[in-house]
Amino acid sequence: LVNYADLGSVKDDFMDEWDHKSNWSERAVLLRNVFDRLDSQGKLLVFLSGDVHCASAYRLTHERYRKARVYQLTSSAISRKPAPSASMLGISAGGELKGSKGVFGERLFALTGNKNFSLLRVRRQAGGQYEVAVDLCWPGEEAGSTIRKRLILD
């Protein structure tokens, strides 16, 4: 309904989403190329995006490209007023991506109702391997405190 009537003048916001039907064909081509390349190279890719309403992290997999390691990380600008907790209903629970046959998203984290930000860190380990970590952060109960959820992307 929003796409046709532009209720609340948010049509453009919905149309630029990763999951909007108008983006499926381009997204499918992009993901197919990413998965194909990463599967043969064994490297990790993180799509970074921003949203003024929420924070989330997903692991993306493809049924044909088992060695590819792909993640999607979304967080907010620190100063934005957060959306209500009820907006969690708009965050995907995961599953197969519509319009991208064989591509699945596994939700690792989701947060609404709080200001938030994320930190992405890449560190070289002793054996020459790299560790990629994401810290998703939001305000704690006490003034000046921060809660942090760390994800190690493997």
Name the predicted role of every residue range.
Residues 1-154:
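Long, structured stretches of catalytic cores involved in phosphate-ester chemistry, encompassing
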